[in-house]
């Protein structure tokens, strides 16, 4: 179920202050964040956010299509290496 419209989008206060400061200074360095639950807002477009995936920070360049999604959707946490092939089937 989506979030109620009367509540508005959720974004951590510390991340919002970093985004506003970077937009004010036209700073292009990545903003490190552990807040995967924060929603992408229109004032984040054009910024690079380094989102933590549990092991490292993944750089995410925000564009217009990402607005309204959560940051965690763009930093994959699970690595799929494929199914193990059967040795008999290879011959």
UniProtKB/Swiss-Prot annotation:
Entry-linked Pfam families: Ribosomal_S19 (PF00203)
Entry GO terms, CC: cytoplasm; small ribosomal subunit
GO biological process, alphabetically ordered: ribosomal small subunit assembly; translation
InterPro entries documented for this protein: Ribosomal_uS19, Ribosomal_uS19_bac-type, Ribosomal_uS19_CS, Ribosomal_uS19_SF
Keywords, sorted A to Z: Ribonucleoprotein, Ribosomal protein, RNA-binding, rRNA-binding
A GO molecular-function annotation: structural constituent of ribosome
Physiological role: Protein S19 forms a complex with S13 that binds strongly to the 16S ribosomal RNA.
PANTHER family registered for this protein in UniProt: RIBOSOMAL PROTEIN S19P FAMILY MEMBER, SMALL RIBOSOMAL SUBUNIT PROTEIN US19M
HAMAP family: Ribosomal_uS19
Family to which the UniProt record says this protein belongs: Belongs to the universal ribosomal protein uS19 family.
Name this polypeptide is given: Small ribosomal subunit protein uS19
Annotated source species: Saccharophagus degradans (strain 2-40 / ATCC 43961 / DSM 17024)
Underlying gene: rpsS
């Amino acid at each position: 179920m989506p979030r109620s419209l009367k509540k508005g989008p959720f974004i951590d206060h510390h991340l919002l202050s970093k985004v506003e400061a970077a937009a004010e200074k036209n700073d292009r360095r990545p903003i490190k964040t552990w807040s995967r639950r924060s929603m992408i807002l229109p004032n984040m477009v054009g910024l690079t956010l380094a989102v933590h995936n549990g092991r490292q920070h993944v750089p995410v360049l925000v564009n217009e299509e990402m607005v309204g999604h959560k940051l965690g959707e763009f930093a994959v946490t699970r690595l799929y290496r494929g199914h193990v092939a059967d040795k008999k089937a290879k011959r």
